[in-house]
Regions:
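N-terminal secretory signal peptides that target proteins for export/translocation
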Residues: 1-16
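Bacterial N-terminal signal peptides
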Residues: 17-30
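Sec/Tat signal peptide C-region and signal peptidase I cleavage site
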Residues: 31-35
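Mature N-terminal segment immediately following signal peptide/propeptide cleavage
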Residues: 36-79, 96
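Repeat-blade elements of multi-bladed beta-propeller folds
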Residues: 42-46, 86-109, 140-178, 215-240, ...
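Extracytoplasmic/lumenal domain signature
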Residues: 63-79, 110-142, 155, 159-163, ...
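Long hydrophobic segments that form regular secondary structure
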Residues: 307-308, 434-481, 485-490
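N-terminal leader/propeptide and maturation segments of large enzyme subunits in energy/redox metabolism
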Residues: 412-434
Length: 546
């Protein structure tokens, strides 16, 4: 659930809002050039089904980028100006398909724009409660949905059968764990989708069984299309021991009928643990008919004393058979997660050059700053993975994993170690305060587990890498990855009584871990001035030679 944590840093909010303005201006110019030039589309969140995030367009380059001018701006008005986490964030990647620009807003509306002019062609409003005027809408399920990262596009591929209503569709994860199907030309709900369940125009995870307690909401990330399936994941409240299971479901793109579902939690443990969901994006390989999932930690975050058993499909890259939803292969990259090291960003599915051969790769960037690479047909590692001994937990009832998997032969793309002498401060006093705090807390390098006294987690749940993912350049065989270098302080505190489970969370890092003996208290590792103690740069862009 680090998507909530991402909003907690003031620096992150500032950079996000500045980037929003720049992105609208630059993308407007880019789309105009595309429409007038090569006509190249961007029909999926990552540009293509495998999520390479690479465009072949060459009209805009480093020689003329400074000459770009604003072509048009569009303002939806869907903005909640409130302190985190109640404020909205514009995090969307628009799609360019069907001669139209499609995107969603933090308040769940979908817009279709003319790419050349920015004029609205249609707007879909699911009549979601408006948090700006409806106090009930500020409850956690809707607060955490006040962002939308994209939609999915599908069209009939049968020759001569691509005309008429809903032959081209936009799919969107919506409130109350729904998946909407819209006519891409008009924005009208496709009445055949979901009709069998009594709600024409949308399918719902809520129609199907899910063990556990707490929140089950639609993912802020878009669904993904593979053939005649739309595949959708969900977000859950992983601060509850017996949370909802992180089930991924595939629906028929036309009827909305359930075709298969995947549950990462073993049946024998579904009454004691949950989550391991996919809140980030999913990638697919149409040629091999494979679905690639980046799963998250099982519940609860930061304390796993109630799940001292193996959940191999949590914190794992999982390849599913697109026809059945069965696991073809999986590789877990975090053992017994106590750090909120959810897998974030879709696995990038590209053919890379390595050892003189072309290899079908699935590349996984992680919060830890490691890049894992696998053969996407077999799951075999493309470079060695070793087990490294890591620090033990001193929290009563907890048992941290003895080792963690570490890739060898590929340099990390993020800072992975803190040293006292490198800590940052705007002034000598500021720096001294960071060093004093460092001395008081537990820190034994990467994978230092949460503690009673308080531990520094670095890389933190912010990353390293995060949901923006990575981009591959086929010409240079380089993978470009952005990273954040911010630490957090996590402390687990014994509860006085069960009533603490009923208290509303202060924020994502200060809350009860429901169903456990503990609550957690956390904050960014920062100085009294609110400046990160971690040394600069706090954000990087790294190119890795594959």
């Amino acid at each position: 659930m680090t998507e909530q944590l991402m909003t907690m840093t003031r620096i992150g909010i500032l950079l996000t809002r500045v980037a929003q303005t720049l992105t609208v201006a630059l993308c407007a110019a880019t789309v105009t050039a595309s429409a007038a030039g090569s006509g190249a589309d961007w029909p999926a969140f990552g540009g293509d089904p495998g999520g390479s995030q690479h465009s072949p367009l060459a009209q805009i380059n480093k020689g003329n980028v400074k000459q770009l001018k604003l072509a048009w701006q569009h303002r939806s008005g869907d903005f909640i100006d409130a302190p985190s986490p109640k404020g909205s964030l514009l995090q969307v990647t628009p799609l360019h398909a069907n001669g139209t620009l499609y995107f969603c807003t933090p308040l769940n509306r979908v817009f279709a724009l003319d790419p050349a002019s920015g004029k609205e062609r249609w707007v879909f409003d699911p009549h979601r409660p408006d948090p700006r005027t409806d106090r009930a809408a500020l409850s956690p399920p809707l607060v955490m949905a006040s962002r939308c990262r994209g939609v999915a596009y599908w069209q009939e591929d049968n020759a001569g059968n691509d005309k008429g209503p809903c032959r081209k569709r936009i799919f969107k994860n919506g409130e109350s764990s729904r998946v909407y199907a819209l006519d891409a030309d008009t924005g009208i709900l496709c009445a055949d989708f979901g009709a069998a369940k009594g709600h024409p125009g949308w399918a719902s995870h809520a129609d199907y069984e899910n063990h556990g307690e707490g929140l089950m909401a639609s993912s802020t990330s878009p669904p993904v299309v593979l053939g005649d399936l739309v595949i959708a994941a969900m977000s859950v409240n992983d601060g509850i021991a017996n949370a909802k299971d992180g089930i991924v479901r595939a629906f028929d793109v036309r009827s909305g009928e359930l075709r298969w579902e995947f549950n990462p939690i073993p049946p024998e443990y579904r009454n004691v643990s949950g989550a391991a969901n996919v809140w980030s994006t999913i990638s697919v390989d149409p040629q091999r008919n494979l679905v690639f999932l980046p799963t998250t930690s099982p519940s609860t975050d930061y304390y796993g004393g109630g799940r001292r058993f193996d959940i191999p499909l949590a914190n794992a890259i999982v390849a599913l058979d697109g026809a059945t939803g069965r696991v073809v292969w999986s590789r877990q990259v975090v053992r017994h997660d106590l750090f909120d090291y959810d897998l974030v960003g879709h696995p990038v599915l590209v053919d890379i050059r390595r050892g003189g051969k072309t290899v079908p790769a699935a590349l996984l960037q992680t919060k830890m700053g490691w890049l894992f690479g696998f053969d996407r047909s077999t799951g075999d590692p493309l470079w060695p993975i070793v087990e490294r001994v890591v620090p033990k937990s001193d929290v009563p009832g907890e048992m941290a994993a003895a080792t963690q998997p570490v890739p060898e032969g590929m340099a990390p793309f993020a800072r992975q170690e803190l040293r006292r002498e490198d800590l940052f401060g705007l002034t000598p006093l500021d720096r001294y305060a960071c060093q004093k705090k460092f001395d008081e807390l537990r820190y034994e390098g990467m994978y230092t587990p949460p503690s009673i006294r308080g531990s520094i987690l670095f890389p933190s749940a912010l990353g390293g890498g995060n949901w923006g993912g990575a981009a591959y350049d086929p010409a240079s065989n380089l993978l470009l990855v952005k990273a954040e270098n911010l630490a957090t302080v996590i402390k687990v505190v014994a509860k006085k009584d069960a009533r603490e489970d009923q208290a509303p969370p202060k924020d994502y890092l200060t809350r009860s871990l429901v169903g456990t003996p503990y609550r957690m208290e956390g904050e960014l590792f920062q100085s009294p001035l609110g400046i990160p103690c971690t040394p600069t740069p706090w954000g990087t862009l790294t190119a890795l030679d594959l």
